[in-house]
Amino acid sequence: MNVSAIVVEYNPMHNGHLYHIKKTKKLTNCDALVCIMSGNFVQRGFPSILDKWTKANIAISNGVDLVIELPTLYSLSSAEFFSFGAVSILDSLNIINSICFGSEIGNINALQDIATTLLEEPLEYKILLKNYLDKGISFAKARNLALVELNRDNKIMSENISKILSLSNNILGIEYLKSLLLLNSSIKPFTITREGADYKDENLHEEYSSASSIRKYLKENKNINILKDFLPLEGFLEFKRLITKGYNFSMEDSMINYIRYKYISGYKNLHNLIDVSEGLDNRIYKSLEKNFTYDSLVGEIKSKRYAYSRIGRILCQYFIGFENYDLNSLLKSTPNYMRVLASNEMGLKVLKKIKKHSSINIYTKLPKNTNTLLSLDIKATNAYSLLNNNIRFNEDYFRSPTIIKNTIY
């Protein structure tokens, strides 16, 4: 059985994601497609607009065979740890033949060259990186500048690196490749050219609109029918059904009052979070005292050194309670379990193969004794239940994976 994998967030799933699924199947000629997906919180530091079970069901209805949850620790981490968490789980299954991700460049060799340099970190690169960091530049920007200068004698390569590293999907793809190299994985990487609007684009476009634009529309409008052209049919019908039921779509603004209440209640322990350094905690506390919306809060805190997404993740981690965990130790280890969210009949065959070839713990129901990583997932869902009244406290203990039969793909 030829099994391919994709790493996704689906916040929410749109036509660009469906394109990714179809192109992956065509490019890899796979018999089955496994998807590892962020759960109730996503990498930019937002709550997912739909709960993880609903997202998983929509994915199965659109051509995925098995959906595995990416632990919250990784889904709310930097691109480096987000990618490592996903790839390490896929690698430990011992049955994944390939992974396919979208990138703006669509050239696997160019991304592979950069990934190799970043992983090996030659001495000149380290020196250049330190020099830029000492100037107060953010790590991501400093890394880009160091790579460009490292290749200054090759003008074409230098210009290409600068362009490649300015685009988010290229950066994430490089991190997937770094993780594969670090793990000495046999999984073969593929990339496809990303189609559609940039993820930051908040305007709806024909055929391929960004998840940001769809969330913005749902936040500001009640006429769901407008989105029919931008969502896969099964996803659109599910949105209509959820609206009829009075489903509570979760947006980032829904966290703000809980975050402010936690702060004024005396929980001033942001310094325990990995991404918080150099007095950033005090900067956040001061902003919490005078900002009442998510955008105004993050907008005031972010700076040349602290990117919007980093601040968003810090706030989301604080909301959930990450500061009470030993995050350094957790991130240095690799996950020893996979949590199944949904499957079809082909996915069940994939699960049987995983059981045969891997020692990883497979959870379709939560065990009585949970490890720290899994307990953080449970805590995240409980925090999410404050934002989405369709999700119960301890929902993780009540839900089993959905098995969907007779999907059309």
From Swiss-Prot:
Catalyzes the formation of N(4)-acetylcytidine (ac(4)C) at the wobble position of elongator tRNA(Met), using acetate and ATP as substrates. First activates an acetate ion to form acetyladenylate (Ac-AMP) and then transfers the acetyl group to tRNA to form ac(4)C34. GO terms for biological process: tRNA modification. It comes from the Bacteria. It is an enzyme of class 6 (ligase). Belongs to the TmcAL family. Its EC number is 6.3.4.-. The lineage of its organism: Bacteria, Bacillati, Bacillota, Clostridia, Eubacteriales. It catalyses: cytidine(34) in elongator tRNA(Met) + acetate + ATP = N(4)-acetylcytidine(34) in elongator tRNA(Met) + AMP + diphosphate. It is found in: Cytoplasm. Keywords: ATP-binding, Cytoplasm, Ligase, Nucleotide-binding, RNA-binding, tRNA processing, tRNA-binding. Pfam families: HIGH_NTase1. ATP binds at residues 7-20, 102, 169, 194. This is tRNA(Met) cytidine acetate ligase. It comes from Clostridium botulinum (strain Kyoto / Type A2). GO terms for molecular function: ATP binding; ligase activity, forming carbon-nitrogen bonds; tRNA binding. HAMAP family: TmcAL. Its main location: cytoplasm. The gene is tmcAL. Transmembrane segments: none annotated. One of its GO terms (cellular component) is cytoplasm.
